[in-house]
From Swiss-Prot:
It comes from the Bacteria. One of its GO terms (biological process) is cytoplasmic translation. GO terms for molecular function: rRNA binding; structural constituent of ribosome; transferase activity. Residues 29-57, 224-278 are annotated as: Disordered. Part of the 50S ribosomal subunit. Forms a bridge to the 30S subunit in the 70S ribosome. One of the primary rRNA binding proteins. Required for association of the 30S and 50S subunits to form the 70S ribosome, for tRNA binding and peptide bond formation. It has been suggested to have peptidyltransferase activity; this is somewhat controversial. Makes several contacts with the 16S rRNA in the 70S ribosome. It holds the Pfam family Ribosomal_L2. Keywords: Ribonucleoprotein, Ribosomal protein, RNA-binding, rRNA-binding. GO terms for cellular component: large ribosomal subunit. This is Large ribosomal subunit protein uL2. The gene is rplB. The keyword Cell inner membrane does not apply. Transmembrane segments: none annotated. Residues 258-278 have a biased composition (Basic residues).
Length: 278
C-alpha cells in the first residue's frame, strides 16, 4: 500500500491524502460471505444514545471473517483475492480451500494473490499460516491471537498491528502487545504468522470533517463549549477552563478505568506505559 497526496486545490484537499489501493485485486466481495449490516447510530434497543459521536456514514455490508481456523487444519488454501473491507482498517484475503470452501481472513503484510496458506501444527512459519503458540518459535512476529483456546482471534487485528512471542513457560506464552504490555496467554491459543498489512493507513490525513462523516463519525463537542445543563464544564462568562478537574458529561473523573481487582490482572507481567493517573 502507498499513500497518494492531493494538491491543495480546495481547503478540504489541502494536506489530505488517500490510500492508492494498488494491492486490491477485486472490487466486489464474495456474495456467500456477505451479511447485512444495520446502522445503530450509537443507540441501544430503547433508542437512547449509548455511544456518542456515531451516526450517518455510507451504507456497508459486513464481510464474515474467519477468526477460528482450527477446523481447517491440514487443508491447504490458495489466496484468490485481496479485497477492501469498509468495516476494518486492514485488507482482507479471500481463501479458496482445497475442499471447495471459501473464507475471508485478515490479510497480513506480504501476502499476495496466488500464495498458499496452511493451518495446523505442521504449517510452515510464514505470513498467513495459522497454528498454536506452542508450535511457533520464540521471537516470531504474530497477529490475530486468541485470548482463550478456541475462542477466536481477539488481539492484533487492525492495520499494522503485530505481537512478538517473547517466551514459553510451561502451558503459558509471554507476548509483547502493540501497546508495550507483556502478558501471559495459554500456549494452546492460536495465532497467525506475520503482521497485519496496510500499516501506512495510520499516516492518512483525512483532510476535512466531511470524510469522517462518510465513515459514520459525528462531531465531538468540548464540554467547556456547552451550557451548564449539558456538561459539568459548561457555562461561565466568556471562555473558561472548566473550573474543575476533567470529568465526563456524567461527572466521572478522567483517568484509568480498569479495575485494580480485575481477575485477568494476574496474566499481565508488565503494564503498558501510560500518562493517565488513577
Amino acid at each position: 500500500m502507498g499513500i497518494r497526496k492531493y494538491k491543495p486545490t480546495t481547503p478540504g484537499r489541502r494536506g489530505s491524502s488517500v490510500a492508492d489501493f494498488v494491492e486490491i485485486t477485486r472490487s466486489t466481495p464474495e456474495k456467500s460471505l456477505v451479511r447485512p449490516l444495520h446502522s445503530k447510530g450509537g443507540r441501544n434497543n430503547a433508542g437512547r444514545v449509548t455511544v456518542r459521536h456515531q451516526g450517518g456514514g455510507h451504507k456497508r455490508a459486513y464481510r464474515v471473517i474467519d477468526f477460528r481456523r482450527h477446523d481447517k487444519d491440514g487443508v491447504p488454501a490458495k489466496v484468490a483475492h485481496i479485497e477492501y473491507d469498509p468495516n476494518r482498517t486492514a485488507r482482507i484475503a479471500l481463501l479458496h480451500y482445497a475442499d471447495g470452501e471459501k473464507r475471508y481472513i485478515v490479510a497480513p503484510r506480504g501476502l499476495s494473490q496466488g500464495d498458499r496458506v496452511e493451518n495446523g501444527p505442521t504449517a510452515d512459519i510464514k505470513p498467513g499460516n495459522n497454528l498454536a503458540l506452542r508450535n511457533i518459535p520464540v521471537g516470531t512476529t504474530i497477529h490475530a491471537i486468541e485470548l482463550r483456546p478456541g475462542g477466536g482471534a481477539k488481539f492484533a487485528r487492525s492495520a499494522g498491528a503485530s505481537v512478538q512471542l517473547l517466551a514459553k513457560e510451561g502451558t503459558m506464552a509471554h507476548l509483547r502487545m502493540p501497546s508495550g504490555e507483556i502478558r501471559l496467554v495459554d500456549a494452546r491459543c492460536r495465532a497467525t504468522i506475520g503482521e497485519v498489512g496496510n500499516a501506512e493507513q495510520s499516516n492518512i490525513n483525512w483532510g476535512k470533517a466531511g470524510r469522517m462523516r462518510w465513515k459514520g463519525v459525528r462531531p465531538t463537542v468540548r464540554g467547556v463549549a456547552m451550557n451548564p445543563v449539558d456538561h459539568p464544564h459548561g457555562g461561565g462568562e466568556g471562555k473558561t477552563s472548566g473550573g474543575r478537574h476533567p470529568v465526563s458529561p456524567w461527572g466521572q473523573k478522567e483517568g484509568r478505568t480498569r479495575s485494580p481487582k480485575k481477575a485477568s490482572n494476574k496474566y499481565i507481567v508488565r503494564r503498558r506505559k501510560t500518562n493517565k493517573k488513577r
